[in-house]
């Protein structure tokens, strides 16, 4: 009986340690706001070029999107 109590206690302790390692700090990601680029001209073919123009406008990045392929700048709200 004493052996089984020790075994159950050890198994429960290992289980709690295993669960606790998966419960690290939770990070919350900021929302991303988008705004149409004012300086990008023409259809947006390269997301890299769009991101460079948006960096010059003071944004964090940019991407091409939409049917008409426009450049939209992105930043954290």
From Swiss-Prot:
SUPFAM superfamilies: Scorpion toxin-like. GO terms for biological process: defense response; defense response to fungus; killing of cells of another organism. Pfam families: Gamma-thionin. It is found in: Secreted. Residues 1-30 form the signal peptide. PROSITE patterns: GAMMA_THIONIN. Disulfide bonds join 33-77, 44-64, 50-71, 54-73. Gene3D superfamilies: Knottin, scorpion toxin-like. Expressed in the whole plant except roots. Its main location: secreted. InterPro entries: Defensin_plant, Scorpion_toxin-like, Scorpion_toxin-like_sf. Keywords: Antimicrobial, Disulfide bond, Fungicide, Plant defense, Secreted, Signal. Belongs to the DEFL family. Confers broad-spectrum resistance to pathogens. This is Defensin-like protein 1. It comes from Arabidopsis thaliana.
């Amino acid at each position: 009986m004493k052996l089984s109590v020790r075994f159950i206690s050890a198994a429960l302790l290992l289980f709690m340690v295993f669960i606790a390692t998966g419960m690290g700090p939770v990070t919350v990601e900021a929302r991303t706001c988008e705004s149409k680029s004012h300086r990008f001209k023409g259809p947006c073919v390269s997301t890299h070029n769009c991101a460079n123009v948006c960096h010059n406008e003071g944004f964090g990045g940019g991407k091409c999107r939409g049917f008409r392929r426009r450049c939209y700048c992105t930043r954290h709200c």
